[in-house]
């Protein structure tokens, strides 16, 4: 996905879409430094691009993201990093659970990172909070996709473990559910 400059009014997005990109990366609260603050979101919607959106629970629960959801109900948005929840989250994970209510929007999917983002290091993780399971329950496997978070994952559990640990941890899911999470969802959302 293309990183978008804050002052882009959609011109650069259009340029790169003509070259074949299929997605852009915007913070869930992103606003263009332009007369139309939603210009980047609007351009993505007009061009049928996917928006990969890094966020935190507080950003997702804010007015800016609510406006995006209201204004662009058909825009495909991937919420990155399990909505930005990290290893400081504690049960009952109220803010995180509130972000998972966005699963009611069929245009949203969520990215499952390496577990080092939300488990206490080092790997192997001894205590795994149920955050992945909560996301899968809310969104369903066909709207959850694994992503390594490379290169930052290299300084946490390492790339190999970022895939092998979630696959092992979620081994109780059916083969079909795991196929969606570890491949099919990304293929469908990113149109490969």
Whereabouts are the PLM-identified features?
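Short glycine-enriched loops at secondary-structure junctions
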Residues: 4-8, 29-30, 150-153
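Glycine-rich phosphate-binding "P-loop"
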Residues: 16-31
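Short, well-structured secondary-structure segments
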Residues: 1-6, 22-25
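Divalent metal-coordination and catalytic microenvironments
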Residues: 24, 44, 81, 110, ...
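Short, acidic/polar
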Residues: 5-16, 36-37, 94-95
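Mid-to-C-terminal alpha-helical segments outside catalytic/metal-binding sites
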Residues: 134, 138-145, 154-192
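Short beta-strand segments
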Residues: 1-4, 111-114, 145-147, 182
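Catalytic pocket-lining loop regions of alpha/beta-barrel enzymes
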Residues: 31-145
């Amino acid at each position: 996905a293309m990183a978008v400059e804050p002052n882009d009014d959609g011109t650069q997005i259009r340029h790169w879409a003509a070259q074949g990109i299929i997605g852009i990366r915007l913070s869930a609260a992103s606003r263009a430094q332009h007369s139309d603050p939603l210009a980047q979101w609007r351009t993505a919607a007009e061009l049928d691009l996917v928006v990969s959106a890094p966020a935190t629970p507080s950003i997702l629960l804010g007015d800016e993201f609510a406006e995006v959801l209201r204004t662009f109900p058909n825009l495909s948005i991937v919420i990155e990093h399990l909505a930005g929840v990290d290893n400081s989250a504690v049960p009952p994970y109220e803010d995180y659970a509130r972000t998972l209510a966005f699963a009611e929007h069929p245009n949203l999917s969520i990215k499952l990172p390496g577990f080092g983002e939300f488990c206490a290091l080092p790997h192997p993780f001894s205590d795994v909070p149920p955050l992945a399971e909560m996301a899968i329950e809310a969104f369903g496997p066909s709207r959850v996709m694994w992503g390594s978070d490379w290169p930052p994952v290299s300084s946490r559990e390492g790339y190999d473990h970022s895939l092998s640990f979630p696959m092992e941890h979620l081994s109780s899911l059916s083969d079909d559910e795991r196929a969606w999470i570890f491949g099919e969802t990304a293929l469908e959302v990113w149109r490969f």
